[in-house]
């Protein structure tokens, strides 16, 4: 793996450099765990280049199934980075990795990549606040699952979690397992029920105690993952784990709130939650 040591390959720099706008870099980050490079979009707040002595918090943004590292690098992401005064880091999850270290595919080690390799790489390259108080993680759908999965399991790395309509218990969605790529991640369900159970966010949530995490969930009432997120909410409530659960009213159609426009609205709320955490040390929407 020596070929990856210290390797940095910037393939596109400064996609947006107009005055007052976040600066975007698309980079390739080496992963020793997977033996290859992963595309990552990094969003730097406009102030980053003007204040060379300032260190910035970092928000890791995980895309959903079928999307890529550019998903969060939209107008909402850029505005969030500028107004929030944080660095946005958007890794590519190979389409449908579910941000797991796959128990059936050793070539997919995305938990290790994001929570360990990417965090270390970002902290070594950019002026970051290199502690959990300076890091948060968010994502939508598969990315919301990923944010919870990594945030619950790496509490010393990420200080706040923003779950946007996450697939936090996909066992109830049997008809979608194949198209969502879950069989490639976790194997056949009937032959690997224990593996599937261990890899659900609701299973990890049951291990949490009050104060372990700062979590905000945003989900629409017209979302096929609504009940999954309500289940997560019930588990945390029953265990007296403080968290925020926000439901936004949508149409009755179960897909009306599982869209990019809804994600953008939810992301703006999540970014406000993170700003409060970074500036006051307390996660909240006040």
Where are these regions (language model features)?
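Bacterial N-terminal signal peptides
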Residues: 6-16
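Non-catalytic cap/lid and distal C-terminal segments of serine-dependent acyl enzymes
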Residues: 20-286
């Amino acid at each position: 793996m020596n070929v990856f040591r210290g390797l940095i390959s910037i393939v596109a720099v400064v996609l947006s450099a107009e005055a007052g706008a976040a600066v975007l870099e698309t980079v390739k980050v080496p992963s020793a765990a997977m033996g290859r490079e992963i595309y990552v979009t990094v969003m730097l707040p406009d102030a980053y280049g003007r204040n060379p002595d300032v260190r910035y918090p970092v928000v890791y943004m995980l895309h959903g199934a079928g999307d890529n590292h550019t998903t969060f690098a939209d107008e909402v992401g850029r505005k969030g980075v500028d107004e929030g005064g944080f660095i946005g880091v958007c890794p590519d999850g190979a389409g449908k990795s579910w941000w797991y270290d796959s128990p059936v595919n050793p070539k997919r080690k995305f938990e290790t990549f994001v929570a360990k390799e990417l965090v270390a790489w970002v902290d070594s390259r950019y002026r970051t606040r290199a502690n959990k108080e300076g890091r948060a993680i968010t994502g939508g759908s598969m990315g919301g699952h990923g944010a919870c999965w990594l945030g619950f399991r790496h509490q010393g790395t990420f200080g706040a979690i923003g779950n946007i309509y996450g697939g936090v218990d996909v066992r109830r969605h049997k008809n979608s397992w194949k198209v969502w790529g879950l069989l490639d991640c976790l194997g056949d369900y009937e032959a690997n029920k224990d593996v599937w159970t261990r890899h659900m966010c609701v299973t990890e949530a049951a291990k949490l105690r009050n104060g372990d995490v700062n979590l905000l969930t945003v989900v629409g009432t017209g979302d096929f993952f609504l009940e999954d997120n309500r289940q997560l909410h019930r588990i945390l409530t029953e265990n007296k784990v403080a968290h925020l659960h926000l439901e936004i009213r949508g149409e009755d159609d179960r897909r009306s709130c599982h869209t990019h426009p809804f994600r953008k609205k939810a992301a703006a709320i999540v970014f406000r939650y993170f700003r409060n955490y970074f500036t006051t040390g307390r996660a909240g929407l006040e």
